[in-house]
């Protein structure tokens, strides 16, 4: 696979960037998740970062990337509305995996946001998008800038939702390379990896949660529901971090 010039690729229209990365992505599809991480670390520019929501399967990508690149900055965008179990899971994994955790938050506290805007998550798609912009997108953009990131790893999988079904292993988002090492993994592969390495699902998985975000926009899975319907009242799947 040829070397990739981030600056040159960023000058191209989005469609042309996709085409420019097509050959590389075709080859990355043939590699294992570990090989994809190793390739990215060898061929893509640093600084390198890994983002995590510390959701249901978070231990997989955190363990996989961190064992190959110890001390990689792990970005968490904390809304202040995560489940208590999520905060406990963050502490547990940070200690167990010796994570270099970097927590980013909105400039306004949750209480101040509610005083200023009301409960944005109850204000339809527009309100949810504004909430996500304040609490997810802006803090992530700030994290990428402050950490001088040029290559960003994330744990998305195609099986999780229709909006992720056609994502490539390698793309450019927010001006940096974005690598999705486990994009083609199914639920069985995730389970097997967790078992092999003595890792756990998020504590709420045992209570029927397939996806975990904020307390006010996350629902338990019920028969007949798609996984994406358990988030944002079924109005949206993505929080904004992985769009654009």
Swiss-Prot record:
It is an enzyme of class 1 (oxidoreductase). GO terms for biological process: hydrogen sulfide biosynthetic process; sulfate assimilation, phosphoadenylyl sulfate reduction by phosphoadenylyl-sulfate reductase (thioredoxin). It comes from the Bacteria. One of its GO terms (cellular component) is cytoplasm. Its EC number is 1.8.4.8. InterPro entries: PAPS/APS_Rdtase, PAPS_reduct_dom, PAPS_reductase_CysH, Rossmann-like_a/b/a_fold. Its main location: cytoplasm. It is found in: Cytoplasm. It catalyses: [thioredoxin]-disulfide + sulfite + adenosine 3',5'-bisphosphate + 2 H(+) = [thioredoxin]-dithiol + 3'-phosphoadenylyl sulfate. Keywords: Cytoplasm, Oxidoreductase. Belongs to the PAPS reductase family. CysH subfamily. HAMAP family: CysH. Catalyzes the formation of sulfite from phosphoadenosine 5'-phosphosulfate (PAPS) using thioredoxin as an electron donor. This is Phosphoadenosine 5'-phosphosulfate reductase.
């Amino acid at each position: 696979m040829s070397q990739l010039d981030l600056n040159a690729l960023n000058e191209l229209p989005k469609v042309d960037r996709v085409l420019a990365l097509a050959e590389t992505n075709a080859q990355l599809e043939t590699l294992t998740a570990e090989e994809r991480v190793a390739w990215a670390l060898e061929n893509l520019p640093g600084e390198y970062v890994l983002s995590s929501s510390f959701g249901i399967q978070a231990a997989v990508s955190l363990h996989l990337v961190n064992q190959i690149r110890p001390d990689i900055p792990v970005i968490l965008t904390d809304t202040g509305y995560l489940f208590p179990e999520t905060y406990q899971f963050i502490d547990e994994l940070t200690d167990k995996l010796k994570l270099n955790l970097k927590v980013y938050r909105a400039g306004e506290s949750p209480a101040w946001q509610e005083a200023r805007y009301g409960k944005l998550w109850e204000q339809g798609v527009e309100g949810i998008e504004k909430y996500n912009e304040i609490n997810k997108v802006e803090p992530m953009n700030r994290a990428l800038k402050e950490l001088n990131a040029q290559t960003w790893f994330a744990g998305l999988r195609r099986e999780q939702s229709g909006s992720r079904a056609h994502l490539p292993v390698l793309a450019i988002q927010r001006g940096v390379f974005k690598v999705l090492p486990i994009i083609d993994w199914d639920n069985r592969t995730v389970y097997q990896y967790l078992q092999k390495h003595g890792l756990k699902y998020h504590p709420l998985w045992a209570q029927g949660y397939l996806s975990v975000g904020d307390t006010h926009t996350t629902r338990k899975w019920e028969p007949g529901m798609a996984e994406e319907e358990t988030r944002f009242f079924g109005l949206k799947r993505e929080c904004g971090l992985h769009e654009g």
